[in-house]
Curated annotation (Swiss-Prot):
HAMAP family: Heptose_epimerase. Binds 1 NADP(+) per subunit. The gene is hldD. This is ADP-L-glycero-D-manno-heptose-6-epimerase. InterPro entries: Epimerase_deHydtase, Heptose_epim, NAD(P)-bd_dom_sf. PANTHER family: ADP-L-GLYCERO-D-MANNO-HEPTOSE-6-EPIMERASE, NUCLEOSIDE-DIPHOSPHATE-SUGAR EPIMERASE. Catalyzes the interconversion between ADP-D-glycero-beta-D-manno-heptose and ADP-L-glycero-beta-D-manno-heptose via an epimerization at carbon 6 of the heptose. It comes from Polynucleobacter necessarius subsp. necessarius (strain STIR1).
Length: 339
């Protein structure tokens, strides 16, 4: 049976395709917008049976061209939180997903889609509940609105197959180089350290000390595992947080990156204080442009995910970032012109 992955040349989508390949799944249709064209690298070592541009995909799917489809992983979206074109964002993220939902409903196809922790925006509580959702930008709103539609459909029990939304927190890991400035902190710090021997972090802001603003950093390895868990449990629908369940400061990421790079140089690990003293970690003033628009703390509440039966542990920053740095080093040619 066919599996479709939208955003297949993107970060999370390509990792899902890879994991499906490891399972022996090759009957995969990849959907994306290959602008920039360099994203093709994320597909070059993967097995798929067809590729479609996102603009031709919906009509092809609606017409039944793919025969019996088991599931759609919908990872395709504009994820640029600085995008200000609301018409583009709503058409690309909200309306496109609504059309895809209608087709999956008509054909009784499982739909596993990317929501976002951006739906919480300015909230300081990260529980999958309407009162905690306060998106701060049009990206967050585009994801929030589709989640609202799904809540109504869940209540009305109008779905013909599984629908699951994943509120991704700060995801990092392999195959994100095409994202440029929207790539993870770990990715950027790796290249900073490689080029300059140090990494930069924001200084004090929002009541947090230098580098102590904290996020829920989650490895793409864990994100993929959760996606596949729900693929294997089509009886479960809903909207779920997908983070590690831990808030860790940016200092932890910088510390992990610096020590991973030191390990490659066969140097002993250093403490955070030692790295700051050596100027391997430098703090810069918090930019005025981000004041009032920046989340200083996020932490996924995993109560609902655990109640659904997902029991696997999540990688810590120390574990996941160390593995990621090793991957970046081993795949430097794969990442030509990363920024």
């Amino acid at each position: 049976m066919t599996i479709i992955v939208t955003g297949a040349a993107g970060f999370i989508g390509a990792n899902i395709v890879q994991a499906l390949n490891v399972r022996g799944e090759k009957n995969i249709i990849a959907v994306d917008d290959l602008r920039p064209a360099d994203k093709y690298r994320n597909l070059a070592d993967l097995d798929i049976i067809d590729y479609l541009d996102k603009d031709e995909f919906l009509e092809a799917f609606r017409s039944g061209r793919f025969g019996k489809v088991k599931a759609v992983f919908h990872e395709g979206a504009c994820s640029d939180t600085m995008e200000t074109d609301g018409i583009f964002m709503m058409a690309n993220n909200y309306r496109y997903t609504m059309d895809l939902l209608d087709i999956c409903t008509a054909q009784k196809v499982q739909l596993l889609y990317a929501s976002s922790a951006a739906t919480y925006g300015g909230s300081d509580v990260f529980v999958e509940s309407r009162e905690h959702e306060k998106p701060l930008n049009i990206y967050g709103y585009s994801k929030f609105l589709f989640d609202q539609v799904m809540r109504k459909r869940f209540a009305e029990k109008t779905n013909t197959a599984q629908v699951v939304g994943f509120r991704y927190f700060n995801v990092y890991g392999p195959r994100e180089s095409h994202k440029g400035r929207m790539a993870s902190v770990a990715f950027h710090q790796y290249y900073q350290y490689k080029a300059n021997g140090h990494v930069k972090l924001f200084g004090e802001y929002g009541g947090y000390g230098a580098g102590e603003q904290s996020r829920d950093f989650v490895s793409v390895e864990d994100v993929v595992k959760v996606n596949l868990f729900f693929l294997d449990h089509p009886e479960i629908s809903g909207i779920f947080n997908l983070g590690s369940g831990r808030a860790q400061p940016f200092n932890d990421v910088a510390h992990a990156v610096a020590n991973a790079m030191r390990k490659l140089d066969k140097a002993a690990p250093a403490s955070l204080q030692e790295l700051v003293k050596e100027k391997a970690i430098e703090y810069i003033p918090f930019p005025d442009a981000l004041k009032g628009r920046y989340q200083c703390f996020t932490q996924a509440d995993l109560t609902k995910l655990r109640a659904a039966g997902y029991a696997e542990p999540f990688l810590t920053v120390e574990q996941g970032v160390g593995r990621y740095i090793e991957w970046l080093e081993a795949n430097s040619s794969f990442l030509a012109n990363p920024l």
